[in-house]
């Protein structure tokens, strides 16, 4: 393996985004995943259905060129609603105005979008069912 070849373990949100960014920059990125490819087998979940995406997450999507793809399916969340015992409800905003919000996106859709982008950029996804990464031999 040379220094331009990078191996990633895990094709979740972070692994898929990192593979995309590395491949876009000319690195040979290979992602190993023990679960089936959700684009073929369907998204299996295991975590919450929706994901709250803040500005830091949008930044990563912008750098990868994916914000335009995800923005139309994101739902703005301005704050949380507190229901008091006396019956009235109160919105506790996440920020001062609508420039300081978080966004709800479907985790499966985001993951599959990131995997598509990684593959389109030249990254390789290798599915190793029922195998785990237990040791790493770093390059000297």
Name each model feature, range by range.
Residues 2-5, 54-140:
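Conserved N-terminal helical subregion
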Residues 1-14:
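Beta1/beta-strand and adjacent pyrophosphate-binding region of the FAD-binding site
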């Amino acid at each position: 393996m040379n220094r331009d070849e990078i191996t990633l373990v895990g094709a979740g949100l972070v692994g898929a985004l990192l593979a995309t960014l590395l491949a876009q920059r000319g690195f040979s990125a290979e992602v190993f995943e023990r679960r089936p490819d959700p684009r073929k087998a369907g998204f299996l979940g295991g975590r919450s259905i929706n994901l709250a995406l803040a500005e830091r997450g949008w930044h990563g999507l912008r750098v990868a060129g994916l914000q335009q793809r995800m923005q139309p399916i994101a739902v703005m969340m301005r704050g949380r609603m507190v229901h008091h015992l006396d019956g009235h409800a109160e919105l506790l905003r996440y920020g001062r105005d609508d420039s300081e919000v978080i966004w709800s996106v479907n985790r499966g859709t985001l993951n599959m979008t990131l995997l598509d982008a990684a593959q389109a950029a030249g990254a390789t996804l290798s599915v190793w069912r029922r195998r785990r990464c237990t040791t790493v031999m770093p390059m000297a």
